[in-house]
Structures are given as C-alpha cells and as structure tokens.
Amino acid sequence: MSSPSSESSNAKSSPPKEEYRTPGLRGVKTTTLFRAVNPELFIKPNKPVMVFGIVTITMCVAYIAYLHATEENKRELYEAVDSEGNRYTRRKSSKWD
C-alpha cells in the first residue's frame, strides 16, 4: 500500500510543465527583431512611470484648456474711451445681437 501513496505524492509535487507557461507575449517564441522593435510588449510595466505620465498629460491638457479659456475672455473685452477721456473696459457686442 505504500506504493500508491508514493505515486500520489509524486504527482502532487511535480505538476505538468504546461501549467507554468509565462502569460502574455513573454511566453511566445518570437524573433529578436520583433522584440527589438516592440520592447514595450515584453518589458514589465513600470507603474510609477505610468502614473507620472498620466499626471503630466493631464496637467498639459488642463493648461491648454486654461490658456484657451483666458484667451477667449480677452477677445470679448476691450478698452473703451468715452467723450470725457475716461477709460473703461467693455464687453464687445455684436450688431447682430
């Protein structure tokens, strides 16, 4: 009876190699040229760099939106001078409004 128990323990200790394949493209056999051209597919992602990139792009988009909003506000205002020589800022009005 010792032989069946030893066979079951051997089966538990050495699982088939198919279960331990590396997931994704790292386990696929590819050429060196493909790996050189597409290194981002085989390198482990660097999360701090990804977070830095997302924050940087978000800040750039926010800054461009801010510049667009302030430029639009500047276009609608102009400095007017009345008959007495006083200067004041007026909002542009259209003849069609």
UniProtKB/Swiss-Prot annotation:
* Low complexity biased stretches: 1-14
Write out the transmembrane intervals: 49-69
What domain of life does the native source organism fall in? Answer: Eukaryota
Which region ranges are annotated with the description Disordered?
A: 1-26
The protein's UniProt keywords, in alphabetical order, are:
Membrane, Transmembrane, Transmembrane helix
User: Can you supply one Gene Ontology CC term for this chain's record?
Assistant: membrane
Q: Does Amino-acid biosynthesis show up as a keyword for this record?
A: no
Pfam families of this UniProt entry?
DUF4500
Q: How does it sit in the membrane?
A: Single-pass membrane protein
Q: Where in the cell is it found?
A: Membrane
Write down the InterPro entries for this protein, in alphabetical order.
UPF0708
Key word Transmembrane helix present: yes
What family does the entry list?
Belongs to the SMIM8 family.
- Name this polypeptide is given: Small integral membrane protein 8
Specify the species: Xenopus tropicalis (Western clawed frog)
